[in-house]
Amino acid sequence: MTSRTRVTWPSPPRPLPVPAAAAVAFGAKGTDPAEARSSRGIEEAGPRAHGRAGREPERRRSRQQRRGGLQARRSTLLKTCARARATAPGAMKMVAPWTRFYSNSCCLCCHVRTGTILLGVWYLIINAVVLLILLSALADPDQYNFSSSELGGDFEFMDDANMCIAIAISLLMILICAMATYGAYKQRAAWIIPFFCYQIFDFALNMLVAITVLIYPNSIQEYIRQLPPNFPYRDDVMSVNPTCLVLIILLFISIILTFKGYLISCVWNCYRYINGRNSSDVLVYVTSNDTTVLLPPYDDATVNGAAKEPPPPYVSA
């Protein structure tokens, strides 16, 4: 009985890859260089593409974080600008103690600008009438000539030199009132300053009169005695008690000073209104370095720069 034994021959070894140059030398068809480069690029791009795909969520996350950071910085800058514009006028202006008395309205519920125009026109009319009277008196002295008996002794009413001075003062007052009216109408604050200075000077003179009456009450009696005998109500005033006369005169001067002070405040408020209207608003700009805002973080820039690798080198056949 014969037994069969199975003999297994070893498989032939796998042929080694022949280099392209040797294959061409022996007449075999070698691999195309372009195909070799493309296959090698695909083999090398496999891990690289896998790495890029793995880093894609991280890049997207960093891009979203960078975009969110830019939006947060932009909103912060806008809020800072708005807050600076809101607080800049109050912070840059010096608040004076008399600011609480500032108002845009005056008597008869009219605007301070309208009140200043009316006040300037009123003073202009009064000084024009005074100027006409003085000019007519200078042209015809006999019309305003008073005899010594009418004036009560050696009392000279007004000579030519005083008349010329009064005419010059009236002309100056007409010019000042016209400037104030024009400045209030055309909203030019500098034109109102001379009229305001005149009001301050007039107020100071009235204050000096009040102080003189308060310190020297007997001067009133002496002044009344110097008046002509035919002066209206001269004897009635002389018969009044000196103390009561002083109190009446002080009360009258106080009313005049209060009224003049109110007119001064109206003109001053008009000046402030026109000056504030013509002055440009203060703009506050919050500047920042735009390059630091727009540039990405350093880590993201280095990661993105490392991801962009150069293409594989060209291999000649």
Curated annotation (Swiss-Prot):
Q: Write the record's keywords in alphabetical order, separated by commas.
A: Cell membrane, Cell projection, Endosome, Lysosome, Membrane, Transmembrane, Transmembrane helix, Transport, Ubl conjugation
Record PTM:
Undergoes proteolytic cleavage following delivery to the lysosomes. Ubiquitinated by NEDD4.
Q: Where is this region: Required for NEDD4 interaction?
A: 205-221
**Superkingdom classification of source:** Eukaryota
Q: How does it sit in the membrane?
A: Multi-pass membrane protein
| Compartment annotation | Endomembrane system; Late endosome membrane; Cell membrane; Cell projection
One GO MF term on file is: kinase binding
- Any one Gene Ontology BP term: endosome organization
| Entry's Gene Ontology cellular component terms | cell projection; early endosome; endosome; late endosome membrane; lysosomal membrane; lysosome; multivesicular body membrane; multivesicular body, internal vesicle
**Compositionally biased region (Basic and acidic residues):** 32-59
Main localization is: membrane
Q: Where are the transmembrane segments?
A: 117-137, 163-183, 191-211, 244-264
Question: Residue ranges of region Disordered?
Answer: 25-73
Mention any Pfam family matching this sequence.
Mtp
Oligomer status and interactors = Homooligomer; upon reaching the lysosomes. Interacts with MCOLN1. Interacts with NEDD4; may play a role in the lysosomal sorting of LAPTM4B; enhances HGS association with NEDD4; mediates inhibition of EGFR degradation. Interacts with PIP5K1C; promotes SNX5 association with LAPTM4B; kinase activity of PIP5K1C is required; interaction is regulated by phosphatidylinositol 4,5-bisphosphate generated by PIP5K1C. Interacts with HGS; promotes HGS ubiquitination. Interacts with SNX5.
Record function comment: Required for optimal lysosomal function. Blocks EGF-stimulated EGFR intraluminal sorting and degradation. Conversely by binding with the phosphatidylinositol 4,5-bisphosphate, regulates its PIP5K1C interaction, inhibits HGS ubiquitination and relieves LAPTM4B inhibition of EGFR degradation. Recruits SLC3A2 and SLC7A5 (the Leu transporter) to the lysosome, promoting entry of leucine and other essential amino acid (EAA) into the lysosome, stimulating activation of proton-transporting vacuolar (V)-ATPase protein pump (V-ATPase) and hence mTORC1 activation.
This chain belongs to the protein called Lysosomal-associated transmembrane protein 4B
